[in-house]
């Protein structure tokens, strides 16, 4: 029972595959191991480069024997001593011969040995006969009809019933898809050919019988007049008797084998010679999908369903394309999955997404390799299904690549923005360290071009030719837009820093200029001795005019500096306008703060005192006054005091002398520009008369000293002025104190005798002159102090020496010693002298014990 073949239910082995495989068993079950056999025999990888042949004929007519000799197969054959069925179901084996009759045979020829018809085992049951014919016609290019010469002209003997079935199922299968116009080759192999009847005559008989059968079958509408030649080609070959002419039989079989190669439709002689495999015979089922296709066809046949081959081809294409897609995606995953994991890991760890190196080349390479592998294997299937599945595969690949690439561009976007910001900030800092000689706009333009080029290079590396979504122009535009936003932010920050530098410059200049104007209040002197400029101000009433003019000049210069520097930033006119508006507001606040500093209680009181003292202590020429009793101290005091007190109302309010009104602060600051944003106002202090919502008027804004402060200042100034007046009064009165004249008369009368004694003694006169001159010289040279110290030291030294002499006398005098009970002094003792320092004091004793 053909037990040496790989039958259904048996585990497939290489040895069994060497003998073929039972595709359909006698119970009409399909063998799912067919694909294993095709793989083992290397047919599955051949694509369309294979050919499938089926052989039909009555039972025990030598079909299997013919195939074994023709293709080198090992199908089971009937024993010559028995007459029973040998081939059950449908068997398949690969051609084992490479050439025949010296000519190469076609590659990968698959031969199906179909169970013979008219067998006693099945009897009247023709169901399997019809199903096997339908299966063979749906899968095979060439149908070999094995008949004996003496059966030609018979109906049953020539298998005309089987051929009628073939014609009917042909209409059932292929005429549903009229666009394909699939043809088949009926190859009649006439066995035991004697040669009495020419093969041409046998052909004519067979064609005539076949045409009658074709005319008798029912045809679809519109094909009633069709001919059999419209759907079938015919080929004929004759073989001698195998038993009686074995050598000739083998020679003719060898010649017949040479015809199983690729042929071309040319002439009628094609039926008797030339290759039998024409392109239009091929069912266009790739070898790797043949098993699935055959299984689907048989399932439809065995379940008596309406077999639709185009649908089966589409189903096969869908199955195989899905299978191929899964296979090629494995290689794609090998490349892409690690890259996806790197991005996911970075997100999980909270790290900024890193730009993966060479991602574009890896992604594009994996995509191209995957799609090419799919094309190579799947393009052989149904074109519509293949195109659809290719699109689905590309969609799957592109979905993953797009997510990966988008994350890559997002990382490049973030890294680029950060690098751009750092580069600009670093260049600005370097320029500031180098002395401030840098152009912000040039730095921004250079770094922007560099950053855009890096991003563009990365985006181009991710671009895939012909893939619309990989054209990252929107992302490039978005990146460029954000760089512009960052540039604007950096420019705004730089303008803020510029504004701060200008504000510092304004504060510095205001500190000098305003301090100078207020310092002039401390001088009431004129002439060359006046402290500022050699001349005092013409009038003190124009203090605020001078302050305002100095302020306006400084601010105008600051505005010019700011505007010129802002141009190098390529700042818009609106940004410059906002910056100047902020500068004017900040400058006014700085002026107010400086004025408040100058009018602090201690500062303003000191300036008022200096102003008063200059007017009171100095005359109009700036010469200090020496008070005499005859001077009008009260009048000068009153005038100087009232003049100085007149400064208090002047200092109380910021008013210009010409209009006696505050300066036009709203006009100076100007209307708030339309481009001012909330953040531009965060650090601005409210200004009265400008910011009405603060509820502070311009009059209040320009008030420097409040009423209570003014009164307190006046009281304290008057007390201070009164003290100066009392001091001057005392000075005048102290200058008139002198010795009365009668004192000199009394001194002359009482000291007349002493005067005469001195005058009469020249030595006394000389002594007095010498002592007086020496004293004057010592006084002039500041030697009186040292002389007194030396005298004091000499006196103290004399006292000590006297004490030592007295002690020596008491010790050496017997009477005194006995009286005082003092022991005798050793002889040879010296009287010690003290060492004096530079101030005439005893120096500390230095012991000589350390020298021992």
Curated annotation (Swiss-Prot):
First-listed, main subcellular location of the protein, grouped into a coarse class: endoplasmic reticulum
Regions crossing the membrane:
739-759, 763-783
Keyword terms:
Coiled coil, Endoplasmic reticulum, GTP-binding, Hydrolase, Membrane, Nucleotide-binding, Transmembrane, Transmembrane helix
**Molecular function terms in GO for this entry?**
GTP binding; GTPase activity
What EC number(s) does the entry state? 3.6.5.-
Coiled-coil regions, chain positions = 475-500
- Return the HAMAP family for the record: Sey1
Q: What does this protein do?
A: Cooperates with the reticulon proteins and tubule-shaping DP1 family proteins to generate and maintain the structure of the tubular endoplasmic reticulum network. Has GTPase activity, which is required for its function in ER organization.
PANTHER family xrefs: PROTEIN SEY1
Query: What family is this protein classified in?
Result: Belongs to the TRAFAC class dynamin-like GTPase superfamily. GB1/RHD3 GTPase family. RHD3 subfamily.
Q: What is this protein called?
A: Protein SEY1
Native organism = Podospora anserina (strain S / ATCC MYA-4624 / DSM 980 / FGSC 10383)
Lineage of the native species? Eukaryota, Fungi, Dikarya, Ascomycota, Pezizomycotina
């Amino acid at each position: 029972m053909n037990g040496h073949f790989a039958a259904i239910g048996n585990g497939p082995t290489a040895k069994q595959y060497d003998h073929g495989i039972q595709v359909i068993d006698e119970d009409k079950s399909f063998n799912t191991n067919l694909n294993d056999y095709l793989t083992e025999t290397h047919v599955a990888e051949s694509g369309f480069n294979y050919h499938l042949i089926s052989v039909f004929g009555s039972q025990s007519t030598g079909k299997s024997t013919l195939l074994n000799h023709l293709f080198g197969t090992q199908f089971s054959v009937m024993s010559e001593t028995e007459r029973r069925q040998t081939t059950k179901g449908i068997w398949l084996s690969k051609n084992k011969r490479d050439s025949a009759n010296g000519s190469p045979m076609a590659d990968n020829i698959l031969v199906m040995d179909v169970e013979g018809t008219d067998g006693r085992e099945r009897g009247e049951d023709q169901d399997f006969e019809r199903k096997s014919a339908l299966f063979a016609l749906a899968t095979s290019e060439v149908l070999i009809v094995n008949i004996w010469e003496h059966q030609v002209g018979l109906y049953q003997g020539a298998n005309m019933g089987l051929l009628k079935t073939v014609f009917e199922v042909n209409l059932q299968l292929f005429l549903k898809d009229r666009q394909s116009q699939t043809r088949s080759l009926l190859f009649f192999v006439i066995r035991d050919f004697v040669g009495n009847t020419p093969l041409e005559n046998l052909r004519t008989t067979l064609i005539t019988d076949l045409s009658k059968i074709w005319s008798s079958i029912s045809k679809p509408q519109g094909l009633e007049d069709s001919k059999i030649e419209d759907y079938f080609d015919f080929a004929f070959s004759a073989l001698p008797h195998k038993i009686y002419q074995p050598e000739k039989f083998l020679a003719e079989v060898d010649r017949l084998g040479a015809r199983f190669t690729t042929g071309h439709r040319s002439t009628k002689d094609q039926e008797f010679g030339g290759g039998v495999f024409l392109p239009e015979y091929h069912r266009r089922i790739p070898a790797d999908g043949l098993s699935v296709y055959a299984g689907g066809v048989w399932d439809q046949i065995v379940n008596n369903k309406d077999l639709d081959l185009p649908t089966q081809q589409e189903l096969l294409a869908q199955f195989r394309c899905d299978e191929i897609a899964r296979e090629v995606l494995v290689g794609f995953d090998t490349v892409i999955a690690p890259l996806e994991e790197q991005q996911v890991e970075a997100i999980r760890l909270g790290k900024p997404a890193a730009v993966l190196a060479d991602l574009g080349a890896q992604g594009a390479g994996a995509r191209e390799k995957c799609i090419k592998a799919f094309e190579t294997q799947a393009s052989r299937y149904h074109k519509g299904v293949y195109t659809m599945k290719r699109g689905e595969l590309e969609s799957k690949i592109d979905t993953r690549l797009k997510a990966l690439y988008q994350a890559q561009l997002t990382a490049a976007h973030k890294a680029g923005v950060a690098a751009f910001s750092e580069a600009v900030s670093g260049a600005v800092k370097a320029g500031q360290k180098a002395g401030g000689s840098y152009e912000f706009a040039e730095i921004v333009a250079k770094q922007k071009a560099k950053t855009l080029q890096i991003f563009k290079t990365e985006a181009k590396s991710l671009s895939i030719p012909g893939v619309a979504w990989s054209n990252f122009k929107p992302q490039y535009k978005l990146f460029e837009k954000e760089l512009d936003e960052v540039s604007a932010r950096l420019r705004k920050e730089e303008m803020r820093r510029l504004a701060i530098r200008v504000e510092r410059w304004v504060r510095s200049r205001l500190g000098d200029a305003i301090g100078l104007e207020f310092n002039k209040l401390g001088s009431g002197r004129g002439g060359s001795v006046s402290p500022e400029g050699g001349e005092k101000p013409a009038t003190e009433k124009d203090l605020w005019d001078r302050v305002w003019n100095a302020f306006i000049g400084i601010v105008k210069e600051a505005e010019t500096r700011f505007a010129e520097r802002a141009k190098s930033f390529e700042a818009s006119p609106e940004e410059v306008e906002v910056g100047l508006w902020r500068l004017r507001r900040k400058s006014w606040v700085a002026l107010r703060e400086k004025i408040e500093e100058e009018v602090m209680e201690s500062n303003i009181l000191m300036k008022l005192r200096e102003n008063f003292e200059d007017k009171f202590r100095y005359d109009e020429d700036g010469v200090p006054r020496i008070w005499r009793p005859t001077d009008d101290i009260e009048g000068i005091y009153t005038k100087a005091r009232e003049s100085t007190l007149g400064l208090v109302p002047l200092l109380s309010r910021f008013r210009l002398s010409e209009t006696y009104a505050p300066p036009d602060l709203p006009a100076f600051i100007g209307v708030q520009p339309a481009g001012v944003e909330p953040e531009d106002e965060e650090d601005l202090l409210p200004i009265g008369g400008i910011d009405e919502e603060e509820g502070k008027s311009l009059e209040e804004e320009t008030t420097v000293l409040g009423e209570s402060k003014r009164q307190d200042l006046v009281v304290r100034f008057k007390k201070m002025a009164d003290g100066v007046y009392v001091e001057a009064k005392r000075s005048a009165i102290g200058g008139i104190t002198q010795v009365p004249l009668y004192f000199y008369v009394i001194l002359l009368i009482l000291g007349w005798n002493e005067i005469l004694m001195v005058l009469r003694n020249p030595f006394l006169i000389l002594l007095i002159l010498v002592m007086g001159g020496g004293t004057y010289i010592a006084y002039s040279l500041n030697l009186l102090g040292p002389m007194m110290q030396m005298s004091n030291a000499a006196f103290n030294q004399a006292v000590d020496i006297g004490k030592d002499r007295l002690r020596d006398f008491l010790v050496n005098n017997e009477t005194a010693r006995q009286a005082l009970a003092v022991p005798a002094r050793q002889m040879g003792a010296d009287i010690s002298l003290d060492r004096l320092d530079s101030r005439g004091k005893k120096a500390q004793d230095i012991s000589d014990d350390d020298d021992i």
